[in-house]
Amino acid sequence: MADLPTYEYEEKLRSKGYSTIAGVDEVGRGPIAGPVYAAAVILNPNHIPVGLNDSKKLSAKKRTLISEEIMKHADVSIGSASEREIEEINILRASHLAMMRAIEGLKSTPNHVLIDGNLVPRDLTIPAIAIVRGDARSVSIAAASIMAKTSRDLLMCDLGQQFPGYGWDKNAGYPTKQHLNALQDLGVTPHHRRTFKPVHNILYQE
């Protein structure tokens, strides 16, 4: 049980007077196709879903079930940054832009934010702390990781139907062997990130 995320960070903040705490996480920094997604989640301390964990440690079925529980009782917002925005401002800044959009979309304005990673978005004016491996340590960040991943996976499945052959329903845009082979055979789609090396190399090969 020690490996499961806890409510410890949130409890400490609540004891200091912070009543509305959002967990924030992103997904999709590594893919060569599709936008980057982020989720912001304010959990109800009286309704924390059982089994919350880092989304990468859960099966797709389990993620879906827990995401439905999160939606019932929590304030949830999804933000994204497009492939073109990723190309223009780089993936780190685009990830932070998606996080900012997710936070701004919450129904309630949080008075403290817990962010997965080691950097707080520079434009965020709300008090915040970055927690390395936060999705495995804080239930609020774990909830955000689940919501971000389930939302982005759904989008990539939809895009995969529009652009068959790349396997996006399975690889979510990550550079798997199937995806890279399809990139060579079928070419670059509007949803590929043109500044990412495998895509850039095909576009500008001699």
Where on the chain are the PLM-derived regions?
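RNase H-like, Mg2+-dependent phosphodiesterase core
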Residues: M1-E206
